[in-house]
Amino acid sequence: MQYQVDTHTHTVASTHAYSTIHDYLAVAKQKGIRLFATTDHGPAMADAPHFWHFVNLRVLPRMVDGVGILRGIEANIKNIDGEIDFFGDYLKQLDIVLAGFHEPVYPPSDKATHTEAMINTIKSGKVDIITHPGNPAYPIDIDAVARAAAEYGVALEINNSSFEVSRKGSEANCTAIAKAAKEFGTILVMGSDSHVAFSLGGFERALAIIDAAGYPKSQLLNRSPSVLLGFLAQRGHHTVADLQALFDEAV
């Protein structure tokens, strides 16, 4: 199956990434990607874009040559209370909010602390997807996190980049996350975590993990634009309504 949705990408606005929105649109057309989210790192990261970058994402067109663009952020989990580095009404202007642990913002501690911080982030209602929860630098109680994510309707990401260029040793944790998600009915999503446009829609390693765990691919958020947009609308992102209408017209 061709997965046409990618929820996790970075542009040159995060200066350790190397592609523009235009680059992503070109690759999306080549690969048959119909919808992707631009989710640069939240402003607490040293090389992240300024706060205004995210406020001004509204200037991006909704769709270019049949490819939809979601205006988003990969925020940073800042502390054990699950606070993130984007807030208030500005969050409501975004289509999608991802959040995860990043060493420069919230250094690794211990399993209990990581678990509490992640669950508090899930409970906050501000975050739609937890990114790379299988990072071995941040061990968590996987069952507890999967149960909380299922209860609060938050998706857990199986991050393809974690098996290729970063977060080495994530395979066992991600397999356990996929198995727990199957058991507790947690929503999963595959994210390329692309830092260069050529990686857009690259899910091969993530899909292998999901297959090995026996997680039903029929429940993946990536399976169609309408599924992801419906998920985001249900979570209160009314900003996606116009994008939903454009995809409905294209059917």
From Swiss-Prot:
Family of this protein: Belongs to the PHP family.
Cofactor section: Zn(2+)
Record HAMAP family: YcdX_phosphat
Entry keyword annotation includes Zinc: yes
Binding site for Zn(2+) 3: 74, 102, 132
Keyword Chaperone annotated: no
Keywords noted in UniProt: Hydrolase, Metal-binding, Zinc
Bridged cysteine pairs (disulfide): none
CC terms in the record's Gene Ontology section: cytosol
SUPFAM superfamilies xrefs: PHP domain-like
Residues forming coiled coils: none
Gene Ontology biological process terms from the UniProt entry: bacterial-type flagellum-dependent swarming motility
Annotated source species: Shewanella sp. (strain W3-18-1)
The EC number(s) this enzyme carries: 3.1.3.-
Annotated residues for binding of Zn(2+) 1: 8, 10, 74, 193
Transmembrane segments: none
Single GO term (MF): phosphatase activity
InterPro entries referenced in this protein's UniProt entry, alphabetically: Phosphatase_YcdX_put, PHP_dom, PHP_phosphatase, Pol/His_phosphatase_N, Pol/histidinol_Pase-like
Cofactor mode of binding and number, as noted: Binds 3 Zn(2+) ions per subunit.
This protein's name: Probable phosphatase Sputw3181_2734
Binding residues for Zn(2+) 2: 16, 41, 195
